[in-house]
Every structure is written in C-alpha cells, then in structure tokens.
C-alpha cells in the first residue's frame, strides 16, 4: 500500500464473478426482445398485448399519494358492483387482487365505472368455434375484432384547474405558517384543555 489512497475493502461473495450481468451485443438483444414481443402477441391473440386491465389506485406515502397509477388488481367489492363474477374476471382479462381494500368512495366508483366501460367494449371469442355459449360475442363483432397493440384504457392524470382571484387585504395579512403552527398546538393540547374544562365545571358545581 502506498500514498493516501482508500484501503480496498470489497465485500464480495467467493464466486461473485459468475453473477455479473454483461451486455456486449446490445443491438442483437434489442432485436431479440422485439421478436419475443411479436411471438407473445401471436401466442396470446386475440387478447391485448398490454396484458389484463388494472385498477386506478393512489400511490402510497405522503410524498406520492396525490399521484394515480395502475394497481395490482380490482377488489372483490368492485367486481360485485360491476356485476362480474370473481372467478370469471381473470378469464376475460381482468386482474383481481383480493388483498386490496377500498378506502374511499371516489376510488371505488372510478374503478367500478372502469370495469363497466371495459365490459361494454369487450369482445369474447368462443372456446370452440362450433359451439357458441351464452356471453360470447356475435359473429359480426368477432369478424371486426382486432388485437389491441397499445395500452388499453390508459390512466389519464387530470390536471387541477386553478381559479384566479383578486388579492384582498385579509389575504395579505394571513400567515399560513403561523396558522399551521397554531392548529398543531391546538390539536396537541386538545385533550389537556378538555380535561381542565371538565375539572373547572366540576368545581363550579360544588
């Protein structure tokens, strides 16, 4: 060891070199991925290439909960409200997640409407071409049906609309930081103040 260099202290496994992922032929890998996508589209025809439909959910934590994204699957309550049996749903391209819970009415109604829209657009091919069962689409619809190559029913993030108002003297005097601090203090001392008020009322009655 010489000079003022960092002492090597690598925490590697004995055979770490076997697990190094390399990419020496990137153009060929790109071609391979494209061919794999095409083969998959042929294999799953006439289903959409994007996979099953997913619900609209809000992201977790305080930082991201204002953003909406695709979730894992629809809840059993959402399927019931849309009139879709839970065992039928995965067979017609609807993702189901029995762990997820509906915590808001708006989210519940949005996903129910999403399911109803999907159901109205859905074209169901018969398992056997010669035997048509109840629920299968008409021959005219089957003839005109094409495979959806793009993301079907994409989630659109609505931009909030802002209204311009005239600035008043009360608005200029209002201090948002002080207001937040005051409300926090009031919340923190609510229990103690209620207890003191109850004790004072008791003393007055005596």
Swiss-Prot record:
The keyword Ribosomal protein applies. PROSITE patterns: RIBOSOMAL_L13E. GO terms for molecular function: structural constituent of ribosome. GO terms for cellular component: cytosolic large ribosomal subunit. It holds the Pfam family Ribosomal_L13e. GO terms for biological process: translation. InterPro entries: Ribosomal_eL13, Ribosomal_eL13_CS. Keywords: Ribonucleoprotein, Ribosomal protein. Belongs to the eukaryotic ribosomal protein eL13 family. This is Large ribosomal subunit protein eL13y.
